Amino acid sequence: MARPKRGNQVPPPPTEDEWDLRYATKEALAFPEMEKQFPGNCAEAKSRLKVAPTTRTDVQEKLRGSLGTRAIAGSEMDQWQYDIASGARLWYCVDPEKRIVWLTLAAMGHPRSTASKGKRAPRNR
């Protein structure tokens, strides 16, 4: 299988009533590797995002603050997070007019940009 590129569709293609999943950034291009490590969780994530990308669940939430919106192709969109597995996260933006879910980040560890600044977890002694 060829390596994905920005703008490419995430396979498989959507059915008539599903949302289209696409790669928006180079940081999202790690999603196929994530699928290899967490195949079941990623398959469930794709299914949920194709049907209800803006539904808040125990694994899906809108990001807050400066991370809550992002510009893609000149349009400002809400940015969401899907918790694939402990530490593995998928960020995405939703374009309701075109019914496209733009993947913006596939991170195997917790993204640094969501960590609280100046606060560290207590060390185990």
Label the predicted regions.
Residues 1-88, 94-125:
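Basic, Lys/Arg-enriched alpha-helical interface segments
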